[in-house]
């Protein structure tokens, strides 16, 4: 099959997306892609989501934090951003997604908006609710194990882990 001339080929834009979830959430690329397609279909309808052509082209996720590059057609960036914003859960795990930026090439999007994933610090001495508990520290954010109820999100100053 012959290649299309350059002026006929579809032009793409790449959305750099940040993903946050609880530390025990295991979210695979296919799960995030499915949630994105579902959100785009619900928001834009079948013709609109097909026109936007949102697709995850790069993905990394570990310990509750991840990044993705989402491809969208050039004229549909605002609709693709709205579809990404509609993703609130992936495989029953609540997630927070944010579009960090938009670029015309994958390389530029990676260099400008994706910073790589730092390794979170797992600790067993987080002071929370008058007790020492297990927790995961990521920068100023701390996710504390709250018994059978799951996780509680807090800041370092709330947990007494300043400067340690």
Swiss-Prot record:
Enzyme class: hydrolase
Any GO MF annotation of the entry: ribonuclease P activity
Keywords for this protein: Cytoplasm, Endonuclease, Hydrolase, Nuclease, tRNA processing
Keyword Amino-acid biosynthesis among record annotations: no
EC number: 3.1.26.5
Keyword Hydrolase among UniProt keywords: yes
Subunit field text: Consists of a catalytic RNA component and at least 4-5 protein subunits.
Family: Belongs to the eukaryotic/archaeal RNase P protein component 2 family.
Name of protein: Ribonuclease P protein component 2
The encoding gene: rnp2
């Amino acid at each position: 099959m012959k290649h299309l001339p350059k002026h006929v080929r579809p032009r793409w834009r790449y959305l750099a997306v940040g993903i946050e979830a609880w530390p025990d959430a295991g979210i695979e690329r296919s799960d995030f892609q499915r949630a994105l397609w579902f959100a785009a279909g619900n928001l834009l309808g079948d013709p609109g989501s097909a026109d936007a052509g949102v697709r995850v082209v790069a993905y990394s996720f570990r310990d509750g934090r991840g990044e993705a590059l989402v491809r969208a057609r050039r004229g549909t960036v605002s609709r693709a951003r709205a579809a990404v914003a509609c993703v609130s859960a992936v495989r029953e795990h609540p997630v927070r997604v944010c579009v960090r930026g938009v670029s015309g090439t994958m390389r530029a999007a990676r260099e400008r908006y994706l910073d790589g994933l730092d390794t979170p610090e797992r600790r067993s001495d987080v002071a929370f609710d008058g007790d020492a508990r297990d927790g995961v520290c990521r920068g100023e954010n701390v996710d504390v194990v709250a018994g059978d109820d799951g996780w509680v999100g807090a800041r370092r100053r709330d947990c007494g882990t300043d400067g340690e």
